[in-house]
């Protein structure tokens, strides 16, 4: 990785009443908690963007169930936009943390400046490309003749706000990685609350239906984007957006490190596409019903995976900063507490998912059709059987990414996705469309075992090499 010129120590003037997390000196248990909880809550609130849309859409008179399936078909395109934001945000944020740990403010500033330009460029390209290809993509992603009009209507309006979505998601990582996880949470909450207020107004009061849901989402993302820009231009963060230090090597480093989270989300996209295609092709007369049920199941999984990614991603700055400083002891202790937090959260969500009452209440938010509700609750029970092992996968793989150890994190991520795709294709062919829902728990168990083995055998050696590079000795 390119060596940037060392700068002055990164300091914060206490002009603002905002809690500052000192990544290199605060006690690890409290530090992990202060970073993980706001990031987890922020991601949980972020889930409301899609869940609130789908909840209101599912309750539109007469057409709610089909319209809900249409919005679900749009999921891969929405996720693709998020993937590009994550490519830059999750690629640049760990590098900024590492440079801050090295007390290299000039290098950190150059990283943020280049990432800002990359985010804007990607947003423009995505908007143009998605508009040109949206109809073909929606059909390819599984839209039937009845579902397509609702999917196309939602997508046509949603794409107008691509730049807001990319900037709000990508820039938020640079707020969190500087120790201001509370402000990162506020950025997400602003958009979510606005979305909650605007959805019923546009959908029901103004009778805009699916169009109203898309308009509400665009306006909400614009509000989150504006807040993130304010914080990174004029807020209390030590490293702000500047318009200097542009460098192709910096962009290369960001894109290389961010490739892991980008491909992870992109492969999640492939999983959703495979799910929809298999349900459409092997669901027979029930294909529309199965697609609607799957949309609700995936919405439920978002309330697990998004907060879980908040825990593992929000604490990457602790690992990145101390990796930059060469403090192996703090890295080990931090990873231990991150894993404990992730396991606790997933255990709670497992109980919630397996309890008929709680799962039934969730499904009831989307549909009042008894047949849809019964089938969806059953699929939620199946899909979440291995939620607890999923915590191991997220905590360890994201931890490796936070320390810039892409050589280990990328293969582990691909391994889980590959198993899932193979099972999602094989199970419906062999046992029928509903069997596809077993692909998730089976792949989660296998991936968690393999990831744990790789982590405990490979990571200690990589950390020793890092300490040797910095001229330090391992503290036993």
Question: Residue ranges of each PLM-predicted region?
Answer:
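Short alpha-helical transmembrane segments in multi-pass integral membrane proteins
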Residues: 1-38, 96-161, 207-259, 319-386, ...
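Short runs within selected transmembrane alpha-helices of multi-pass transporters and secretion channels
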Residues: 89, 158-176, 187-192, 213-228, ...
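Helix-terminus/linker motif at the lipid-water interface of multi-pass membrane proteins
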Residues: 44, 48-69, 138-145, 201-208, ...
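Residue-level hotspots within pore-lining transmembrane alpha-helices
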Residues: 41, 45, 49, 81-85, ...
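N-terminal transmembrane alpha-helices
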Residues: 23-63, 76-91, 95, 120-127, ...
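Small-residue-rich hydrophobic transmembrane alpha-helices
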Residues: 68-128, 165-184, 291-355, 390-412
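Transmembrane alpha-helix boundary and packing residues in multipass membrane permease domains
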Residues: 39, 43, 55, 94, ...
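Transmembrane helical elements of multi-pass membrane transporters/channels
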Residues: 34-53, 157, 191, 220-224, ...
